[in-house]
A protein has these predicted regions:
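Short cysteine-rich clusters marking metal-coordination/redox-active sites
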Residues: 9-12, 30-33, 232-235, 247-250
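Anionic N-terminal interaction surfaces
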Residues: 28, 35-104
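Acidic, Ser/Thr- and proline-rich intrinsically disordered linker/docking segments
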Residues: 114-226
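Short linker/helix segments within small regulatory modules
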Residues: 19-28, 240-246
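Short recognition patches in nucleic-acid-associated and regulatory proteins
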Residues: 3-23
């Protein structure tokens, strides 16, 4: 088969335009079908046609979960972590039109871990000497930039990590020069207000997500635990508490 022979998508059957082919392990995928895959999915080249078809079915079912998602808490700016604490669900998205973006809706109980990753990059600052050459300072001086990422580890058939940046722009810091030639000063980014702001935000997101994850798991464990019959203090009946912890006969609260 030649380089410019006609190719067709093995998922939807449509003809694939020039430069529109996305290779699969055993076939071809058009860019429109590829666009529907989860944004957290990175194993397309190692996936079979059937595996991609199953994921697209999952993604279509996900639209229904997005429709009924009720946001109870929003964490972050730009890319946001959205919680539906009543249903024990969450999503991560930067989209303004959530229905159109169709972000993956996951159970909080499927979170296996959450960390804050602070990424540092440095660039040496140079100056011109008397001959017009760019040379290092003595001691060398650097400009630093920082980005703050939340990494959420999850149980999901199509991806196991969601990594997103919580600062819209890199935090850039240029430490002041040393007042003593040849002596390098210790630099602490924690003294920078913007750095502290995003580090605190990242820690807050991490702590809240772990807390609501633990709460969701506790609810699941309680619901699965065998119920013990008790005597209702309101109607006197021997009853097994319902899902709300109430008497199955009179509706009186038995727990709380």
């Amino acid at each position: 088969m030649g380089l410019f022979d006609k190719k067709y998508c093995d998922v939807c059957g449509e003809r694939i335009g020039l430069l529109g082919n996305r290779k699969l392990e055993d076939g071809n995928l058009c860019k429109d079908c590829a666009r529907k895959l989860s944004p957290w999915f990175s194993e397309r080249r190692n996936s079979s046609v059937n595996e991609i078809k199953r994921q697209l079915e999952y993604r279509e079912e996900n639209r229904g979960r997005v429709e009924v998602f009720h946001i109870t808490r929003t964490l972050g700016s730009g890319t946001k972590l959205l919680l539906d604490e009543d249903a024990g669900l969450f999503m991560v998205t930067s989209a303004k039109n959530i229905a159109e973006a169709n972000p993956d809706v996951l159970a909080l109980s499927d979170v296996t871990g959450c960390t804050l990753d602070v990424e540092e990059n440095s660039k040496e600052l140079l100056h011109e000497d008397k001959d017009g050459n760019e040379v290092s300072y003595n001691p060398p001086r650097y400009e630093y930039s920082y980005d703050f990422y939340i990494i959420v580890n999850v149980n999901n058939p199509y991806f196991n990590e969601m990594r997103f940046r919580i600062n819209p722009n890199s935090v850039e810091i240029s430490p002041p020069p040393s007042i003593r030639p040849g002596v390098t000063l210790r630099f602490n980014p924690e003294t920078n207000a913007e750095y502290k702001k995003y580090k605190q935000l990242g820690e807050e997101i991490r702590q809240i997500l772990v807390k609501v994850r633990d709460d969701a798991r506790e609810k699941i464990e309680q619901a699965a635990a065998p119920k013990t019959a008790v005597s209702c203090p309101y109607c006197g009946a021997t009853t097994t508490p319902d899902a709300s912890g109430c008497c199955e006969y009179c509706g009186g609260a038995l727990m709380g």
